[in-house]
């Protein structure tokens, strides 16, 4: 089973449990804390992925690292994931949990890359346009890449809308070479 499919199943199971117990926001905070710890500790991620470290040792590590940081429900979930030998997928499971929660709440994540820094007015207008087109709430990440020359590229899930001069020049070059 692929990492994405397995991670989504585990995340979906956790989301179902916390929806029933009405602890979604608390669990989201805990998953963000787990994500933060994993992001800052490569050694922990490698240990959780390692086939050389036993299940018992991995569970001990998880208990020591996350004790007091997560609820009993999340700790039980982490132990279950460990028992199924999937702790190496934990970063993906956390990401999938957040993605599923965003889907349920009608939130889309959008990456906007522009050649110059957008003013607040420009950024707000672009975000509002995307929200109107999608009918969803937009969580935007803005970045600047001067190599784009001018314009902007917008990435929504698997779709990229590229309105950059660099992209237009690339298309022009391709058509001239083909001619």
Curated annotation (Swiss-Prot):
Topology versus the membrane: Peripheral membrane protein
HAMAP family: ATP_synth_delta_bact
Domain of life: Bacteria
UniProt-recorded Gene Ontology molecular function terms: proton-transporting ATP synthase activity, rotational mechanism
Keywords, in A-Z order: ATP synthesis, Cell inner membrane, Cell membrane, CF(1), Hydrogen ion transport, Ion transport, Membrane, Transport
Protein name per the record: ATP synthase subunit delta
Localization per Swiss-Prot or TrEMBL: Cell inner membrane
Entry-linked Gene3D superfamilies: N-terminal domain of the delta subunit of the F1F0-ATP synthase (1.10.520.20)
Family the UniProt entry places it in: Belongs to the ATPase delta chain family.
Gene: atpH
GO cellular component: a single term: proton-transporting ATP synthase complex
Record function comment: F(1)F(0) ATP synthase produces ATP from ADP in the presence of a proton or sodium gradient. F-type ATPases consist of two structural domains, F(1) containing the extramembraneous catalytic core and F(0) containing the membrane proton channel, linked together by a central stalk and a peripheral stalk. During catalysis, ATP synthesis in the catalytic domain of F(1) is coupled via a rotary mechanism of the central stalk subunits to proton translocation. This protein is part of the stalk that links CF(0) to CF(1). It either transmits conformational changes from CF(0) to CF(1) or is implicated in proton conduction.
Transmembrane segments: none
